[in-house]
Protein backbone atom coordinates (compact mmCIF):
# COMPACT_ATOMS: atom_id res chain seq x y z
CA UNK A 1 0.00 0.00 0.00
CA UNK A 2 0.90 3.64 -0.19
CA UNK A 3 2.38 5.22 2.96
CA UNK A 4 2.01 2.08 5.05
CA UNK A 5 -1.60 1.26 4.18
CA UNK A 6 -2.67 -2.31 3.61
CA UNK A 7 -4.14 -3.65 0.38
CA UNK A 8 -7.74 -2.60 -0.24
CA UNK A 9 -7.55 0.48 1.99
CA UNK A 10 -8.02 3.95 0.60
CA UNK A 11 -4.82 5.67 -0.45
CA UNK A 12 -3.61 9.00 -1.78
CA UNK A 13 -1.66 9.18 -5.02
CA UNK A 14 0.54 12.18 -5.77
CA UNK A 15 2.20 12.76 -9.13
CA UNK A 16 3.70 15.70 -10.90
CA UNK A 17 6.17 17.03 -13.39
CA UNK A 18 8.10 20.15 -14.25
CA UNK A 19 8.66 21.03 -17.88
CA UNK A 20 9.97 24.01 -19.76
CA UNK A 21 9.58 24.94 -23.41
CA UNK A 22 11.32 27.65 -25.41
CA UNK A 23 11.11 28.36 -29.14
CA UNK A 24 13.08 30.94 -31.11
CA UNK A 25 12.32 31.95 -34.70
CA UNK A 26 15.49 31.46 -36.78
CA UNK A 27 14.22 33.66 -39.60
CA UNK A 28 13.35 37.33 -39.54
CA UNK A 29 12.19 38.86 -37.22
CA UNK A 30 14.37 36.47 -35.12
CA UNK A 31 12.23 36.62 -32.00
CA UNK A 32 11.02 34.32 -29.25
CA UNK A 33 7.90 32.35 -30.20
CA UNK A 34 7.42 30.71 -26.81
CA UNK A 35 9.04 30.68 -23.38
CA UNK A 36 7.25 29.00 -20.51
CA UNK A 37 7.86 26.76 -17.51
CA UNK A 38 5.16 24.66 -15.88
CA UNK A 39 4.64 22.65 -12.72
CA UNK A 40 1.84 20.09 -13.14
CA UNK A 41 0.48 18.38 -10.06
CA UNK A 42 -2.02 15.54 -9.73
CA UNK A 43 -3.67 14.29 -6.56
CA UNK A 44 -5.96 11.27 -6.41
CA UNK A 45 -7.72 9.24 -3.74
CA UNK A 46 -9.45 5.88 -4.18
CA UNK A 47 -12.11 4.55 -1.84
CA UNK A 48 -14.96 1.99 -2.08
CA UNK A 49 -15.61 2.06 -5.85
CA UNK A 50 -15.07 5.80 -6.09
CA UNK A 51 -12.16 8.11 -6.68
CA UNK A 52 -11.38 11.79 -6.43
CA UNK A 53 -8.96 13.40 -8.86
CA UNK A 54 -7.49 16.91 -9.00
CA UNK A 55 -4.89 18.24 -11.43
CA UNK A 56 -3.44 21.72 -11.69
CA UNK A 57 -0.83 23.75 -13.55
CA UNK A 58 1.33 26.51 -12.10
CA UNK A 59 2.86 28.26 -15.11
CA UNK A 60 5.34 31.04 -15.75
CA UNK A 61 5.09 32.40 -19.31
CA UNK A 62 7.79 34.96 -20.13
CA UNK A 63 6.10 36.13 -23.36
CA UNK A 64 2.39 35.98 -22.57
CA UNK A 65 2.24 37.39 -19.03
CA UNK A 66 -1.55 36.85 -18.78
CA UNK A 67 -0.85 33.10 -19.10
CA UNK A 68 1.30 33.12 -15.93
CA UNK A 69 -0.49 31.79 -12.86
CA UNK A 70 -2.35 28.88 -11.31
CA UNK A 71 -4.92 26.85 -13.26
CA UNK A 72 -7.21 24.21 -11.76
CA UNK A 73 -7.22 21.77 -14.65
CA UNK A 74 -9.44 18.91 -13.43
CA UNK A 75 -11.37 18.24 -10.23
CA UNK A 76 -13.91 15.43 -10.30
CA UNK A 77 -15.55 12.55 -8.44
CA UNK A 78 -15.67 9.26 -10.33
CA UNK A 79 -17.87 6.38 -9.14
CA UNK A 80 -18.23 2.92 -10.75
CA UNK A 81 -20.47 -0.04 -10.04
CA UNK A 82 -20.61 -3.34 -11.94
CA UNK A 83 -22.61 -2.00 -14.92
CA UNK A 84 -22.90 1.75 -14.41
CA UNK A 85 -20.97 4.75 -13.22
CA UNK A 86 -20.71 8.51 -13.27
CA UNK A 87 -18.13 11.29 -13.25
CA UNK A 88 -19.03 14.72 -11.89
CA UNK A 89 -16.91 17.85 -11.99
CA UNK A 90 -14.31 19.65 -14.09
CA UNK A 91 -12.90 17.10 -16.53
CA UNK A 92 -11.46 16.43 -19.95
CA UNK A 93 -13.92 14.62 -22.20
CA UNK A 94 -12.04 12.69 -24.88
CA UNK A 95 -13.99 10.71 -27.45
CA UNK A 96 -12.39 8.85 -30.33
CA UNK A 97 -9.21 10.85 -30.94
CA UNK A 98 -6.62 9.21 -33.18
CA UNK A 99 -3.21 10.74 -33.89
CA UNK A 100 -4.31 14.36 -34.01
CA UNK A 101 -7.55 13.76 -35.94
CA UNK A 102 -10.63 14.89 -34.02
CA UNK A 103 -13.62 13.13 -35.57
CA UNK A 104 -15.83 12.64 -32.52
CA UNK A 105 -13.55 14.26 -29.93
CA UNK A 106 -15.43 17.57 -29.93
CA UNK A 107 -16.65 18.08 -26.35
CA UNK A 108 -13.57 19.59 -24.71
CA UNK A 109 -12.63 22.82 -26.51
CA UNK A 110 -9.06 23.64 -27.51
CA UNK A 111 -6.75 26.39 -26.30
CA UNK A 112 -4.95 27.56 -29.42
CA UNK A 113 -3.09 30.39 -27.63
CA UNK A 114 0.28 28.75 -28.36
CA UNK A 115 -0.99 26.32 -30.98
CA UNK A 116 2.10 24.49 -32.27
CA UNK A 117 4.14 25.08 -29.11
CA UNK A 118 2.06 22.76 -26.90
CA UNK A 119 1.38 19.04 -26.80
CA UNK A 120 -2.01 17.99 -28.15
CA UNK A 121 -3.08 16.79 -24.69
CA UNK A 122 -2.22 20.18 -23.18
CA UNK A 123 -4.33 22.24 -25.57
CA UNK A 124 -7.53 20.42 -24.58
CA UNK A 125 -9.55 22.48 -22.12
CA UNK A 126 -11.59 20.83 -19.36
CA UNK A 127 -15.36 21.33 -19.09
CA UNK A 128 -17.74 21.25 -16.13
CA UNK A 129 -19.81 18.14 -16.79
CA UNK A 130 -21.77 15.17 -15.51
CA UNK A 131 -21.09 11.92 -17.36
CA UNK A 132 -23.27 8.86 -16.75
CA UNK A 133 -22.12 5.46 -18.04
CA UNK A 134 -23.99 2.19 -18.55
CA UNK A 135 -21.83 -0.67 -19.77
CA UNK A 136 -21.31 -4.40 -20.07
CA UNK A 137 -18.84 -6.63 -21.96
CA UNK A 138 -20.27 -5.69 -25.38
CA UNK A 139 -21.44 -2.08 -25.20
CA UNK A 140 -20.91 1.20 -23.40
CA UNK A 141 -23.50 3.99 -23.41
CA UNK A 142 -22.48 7.41 -22.15
CA UNK A 143 -24.82 10.30 -21.39
CA UNK A 144 -23.20 13.71 -21.02
CA UNK A 145 -24.49 16.97 -19.55
CA UNK A 146 -22.38 20.12 -19.97
CA UNK A 147 -24.36 22.95 -18.34
CA UNK A 148 -22.03 25.81 -19.31
CA UNK A 149 -20.55 26.52 -22.73
CA UNK A 150 -16.82 27.08 -23.06
CA UNK A 151 -15.50 27.72 -26.56
CA UNK A 152 -12.09 27.55 -28.16
CA UNK A 153 -9.47 30.08 -27.07
CA UNK A 154 -7.90 31.78 -30.07
CA UNK A 155 -4.81 34.00 -29.92
CA UNK A 156 -6.06 37.45 -30.97
CA UNK A 157 -3.56 39.67 -29.14
CA UNK A 158 -1.14 41.26 -31.62
CA UNK A 159 1.69 40.69 -29.11
CA UNK A 160 1.16 36.91 -29.33
CA UNK A 161 3.44 35.35 -31.99
CA UNK A 162 0.66 32.80 -32.69
CA UNK A 163 -2.06 35.42 -33.26
CA UNK A 164 -4.71 34.53 -35.83
CA UNK A 165 -5.18 38.19 -36.71
CA UNK A 166 -2.92 39.83 -39.29
CA UNK A 167 -0.05 41.83 -37.90
CA UNK A 168 0.17 45.48 -38.80
CA UNK A 169 3.24 46.02 -40.93
CA UNK A 170 5.06 49.37 -40.98
List the model feature ranges, each with a label.
Residues 1-4, 143:
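Short intrinsically disordered, low-complexity coil segments enriched in acidic
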Residues 44-162:
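Outer membrane beta-barrel
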Residues 3-7, 26-32, 62-65, 117-119:
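Outer-membrane beta-barrel domain signature
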Residues 160-170:
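Surface-exposed beta-loop-beta
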Residues 6-26, 35, 50-54:
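Transmembrane beta-strand segments of Gram-negative outer membrane beta-barrel proteins
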Residues 32-44:
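Short catalytic helix/loop segments, enriched in acidic residues and glycine
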Amino acid sequence: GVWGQGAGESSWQLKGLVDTYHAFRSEKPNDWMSSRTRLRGEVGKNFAGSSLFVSFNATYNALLKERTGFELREAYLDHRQEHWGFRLGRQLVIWGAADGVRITDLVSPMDMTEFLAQDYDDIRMPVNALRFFVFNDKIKLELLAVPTFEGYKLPTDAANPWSVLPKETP
